[in-house]
């Protein structure tokens, strides 16, 4: 069975550019609808895909936050090289953490962290997430249940150094959130079981900018960009971007 894997995308629009960042074990499909929505309203949108994502899970464990941050910065530099001077960043989960890191690393017009963790529930929760991703990917490849079980046994023997590195990244970003002066719109799903939702309050309270807002989405889970309130999220993100001083 030919597996069609998501790829980076660029939707060319006007002079205002938005870098869209997906989550850990996710891919650009997580932010594609948001990208289309913003592009239809005049924005240029670019979404990099992190190394080791959208490929067999065996490849994921050989990459880490440093690789993914490089992919994010390459995405930012790509927009710059295409002539976009004004760039906002909008990210889901780990992508939201990266959007905050961009906020104190390079000039950013506005930041939208969506369901972004400021501390991880536990390494075990993350590990279960990786196993679930691996199992689903193998199903997606059309493998038999027996083959999947066999491959999963092997996969579970692989050291997951990535998870510790991810925790370190999140801790580092949390320590620097008070260096963010760009307007920030914190998006958080009420029924988010992947992260500690207190993270949203931490981000909102600690960013240094006065131009900030926090909105809770009462009907949504962690992948808020694909959940039942996604249309509202699209609209709210667009309205936030429209108010920025481009």
UniProtKB/Swiss-Prot annotation:
Cellular component GO terms, alphabetical: membrane
Hydrolase listed as a keyword: yes
Phenotypic consequence of gene deletion: No visible phenotype.
Active site as annotated: 93, 192, 222
Keyword Repeat: no
Highest rank taxon of the organism: Bacteria
Reactions performed catalytically: a carboxylic ester + H2O = an alcohol + a carboxylate + H(+)
EC number(s) reported in the record: 3.1.1.1
Alphabetized UniProt keyword annotations: Hydrolase, Serine esterase
GO molecular function: carboxylesterase activity; lipase activity
InterPro entries associated with the record: AB_hydrolase_fold, Esterase_lipase, Hydrolase_4, MAG_DAG_Lipase
Function: Involved in the detoxification of xenobiotics. Shows maximal activity with C6 substrates, with gradually decreasing activity from C8 to C12 substrates. No activity for higher chain length substrates acids rather than long-chain ones.
Family (UniProt): Belongs to the lipase/esterase LIP3/BchO family.
Name used for this protein in its record: Carboxylesterase
């Amino acid at each position: 069975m030919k597996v069609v894997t998501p790829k980076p995308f660029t939707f060319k629009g006007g002079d205002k550019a938005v870098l869209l960042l997906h989550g850990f074990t996710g891919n650009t499909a997580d932010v594609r609808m948001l990208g289309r929505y913003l592009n239809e309203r005049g924005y240029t949108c670019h979404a990099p895909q992190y190394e080791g994502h959208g490929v067999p899970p065996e490849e994921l464990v050989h990459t880490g936050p440093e690789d993914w941050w490089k992919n994010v910065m390459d995405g930012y530099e790509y927009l710059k090289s295409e002539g976009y001077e004004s760039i906002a960043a909008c990210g889901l989960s780990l992508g939201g953490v990266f959007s905050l890191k961009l906020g104190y690393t390079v000039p950013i017009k506005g930041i939208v962290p969506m369901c972004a963790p400021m501390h991880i529930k536990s390494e075990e929760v993350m590990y279960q997430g990786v196993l679930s991703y691996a199992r689903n990917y193998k199903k997606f490849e059309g493998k038999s249940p027996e083959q999947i079980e066999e491959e999963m046994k092997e996969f579970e023997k692989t050291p997951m150094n990535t998870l510790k590195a991810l925790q370190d990244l999140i801790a580092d970003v949390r320590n620097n959130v008070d260096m963010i002066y760009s307007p920030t719109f914190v998006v958080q799903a009420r029924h988010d079981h992947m992260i500690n939702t207190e993270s949203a309050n931490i981000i909102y309270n600690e960013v240094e900018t006065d131009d900030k807002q926090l909105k809770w989405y009462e009907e949504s889970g962690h992948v808020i960009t694909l959940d039942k309130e996604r249309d509202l999220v699209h609209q709210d993100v667009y309205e936030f971007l429209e108010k920025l001083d481009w």
